[in-house]
Amino acid sequence: MPKMKSHRGACKRFKTTSSGKIKRERMNGSHNLEKKNSKRCRRLHQTALLEGLKAKQIKRMIQA
């Protein structure tokens, strides 16, 4: 049976940390920032960690 291919879209959007957690970028932080307040803009430029079932699903898509 051939090897399963990893999901290329998921590979581009998610990264794994050295401890195995899944890291992602937040949405809505690239343009139209003049409408958003400073606190929101700062928060949108931080990375977020996935938890629970979603992290498990993404790991399967990336590692396949």
From Swiss-Prot:
GO terms for molecular function: structural constituent of ribosome. Disulfide bonds: none annotated. Keywords: Ribonucleoprotein, Ribosomal protein. The keyword Ribosomal protein applies. It comes from the Bacteria. InterPro entries: Ribosomal_bL35, Ribosomal_bL35-like, Ribosomal_bL35_CS, Ribosomal_bL35_sf. One of its GO terms (cellular component) is cytosolic large ribosomal subunit. PROSITE patterns: RIBOSOMAL_L35. GO terms for biological process: translation. Belongs to the bacterial ribosomal protein bL35 family. HAMAP family: Ribosomal_bL35 (MF_00514). This is Large ribosomal subunit protein bL35. The gene is rpmI.
